Amino acid sequence: MRHRLSGRQLNRNASHRQAMFRNMASSLVRHEIIKTTLPKAKELRRVVEPLITLAKSDSVANRRLAFARTRDRDVVGKLFTELGPRFQGRPGGYTRILKCGFRAGDNAPMAYIELVGRPVDAEAVTEE
């Protein structure tokens, strides 16, 4: 029985899943928007949101915790210098998931996951 088992397996063993979400979380922090499958996006929220909450209070201990979870020095720097102050007044809900259809090869549901206060390039969104 699967009583009290949380999280999705995603057809991966534990170390593969941990490495995948560590890489995806680093990419999301670095680029502030990524495209992935819908189940991975929903599960990625559970990894990224606590990282941003951790970054709201800057301390050496919190930076070490964030580094232990991401293993990327640049990502830790961006978390504590940009994202922590940006989300200081927001009590959670730092990510948004937008569904974007189905993948051509295997019809998997795809989604964009982005950070909520993401600056949008005005010149990139032009109507023709």
Curated annotation (Swiss-Prot):
Superkingdom, natural source: Bacteria
GO biological process, one term: translation
MF GO annotations: structural constituent of ribosome
Keyword Membrane: no
Example of a GO cellular component annotation carried by this entry: cytosolic large ribosomal subunit
Keywords of the record: Ribonucleoprotein, Ribosomal protein
PROSITE patterns in alphabetical order: RIBOSOMAL_L17
Pfam families (UniProt xref): Ribosomal_L17 (PF01196)
InterPro entries per record: Ribosomal_bL17, Ribosomal_bL17_CS, Ribosomal_bL17_sf
PANTHER family cross-referenced by the UniProt entry: LARGE RIBOSOMAL SUBUNIT PROTEIN BL17M, RIBOSOMAL PROTEIN L17
Quaternary data: Part of the 50S ribosomal subunit. Contacts protein L32.
HAMAP family documented for this protein: Ribosomal_bL17
Family: Belongs to the bacterial ribosomal protein bL17 family.
Protein name: Large ribosomal subunit protein bL17
Organism from which the protein derives: Tolumonas auensis (strain DSM 9187 / NBRC 110442 / TA 4)
Gene: rplQ
